[in-house]
Amino acid sequence: MAYGLLLLRAFTGAAFAGHGTQKLFGWFGGHGPQGTGGFFSSLGYHPGVRMAVIAGLGEAVGGTLLAFGFLTPAAGTLVAIVMLNAIAAATLKKQFLLGSELELLYLVIGISLVATGPGRFSVDRALGWDDNITGLWWAVGALVVAAMVSAVTLTTFRSKPAPQAATQP
């Protein structure tokens, strides 16, 4: 099980951090803060560039922490916050699970690793923290915090869509 958790955690964390560096620096074919900010603005997030930087930091920091198994509850919570916002943005455009599968997968993996712990090959284990900061209640807490932060983000930094003009039959 230790090797499976290491593989899952390291790959997921690295991939998630890679998405963050796309937003922050334009690495790996990303568009950087300006390009990603325009995309965020098109989803109704304002200011778009600031939200792109915040999402990029959440992904880069959360992914790096997850990859190393360091502060795993914080890492899983960061992953969940960013992914809940991404899923909500897609859902508000009436596209739930039409392109949101990756976001849902990251969310489930992040919260699952909070529940199981990072495994034997992790910084948390090396520091003797893994048994104290994992489990069901840590996962529930991480999900609740993520939902609350996401709700605040969606209600504070996302504008409501403009009313659609009525069409004649």
Region spans (language model):
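Physicochemical signature of membrane-embedded alpha-helices that form the seven-helix bundle of GPCRs
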Residues: 51-54, 58, 78
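Extended, low-polarity transmembrane helix blocks
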Residues: 1-28, 49, 71-169
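Generic signal for short, ordered secondary-structure residues
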Residues: 18-19, 40, 63
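Hydrophobic, membrane-inserted alpha-helices
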Residues: 57-66, 82-86
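Alpha-helix boundary/capping detector
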Residues: 33, 46, 65-67, 110-111
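Membrane-interface interhelical connector segments
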Residues: 26-54
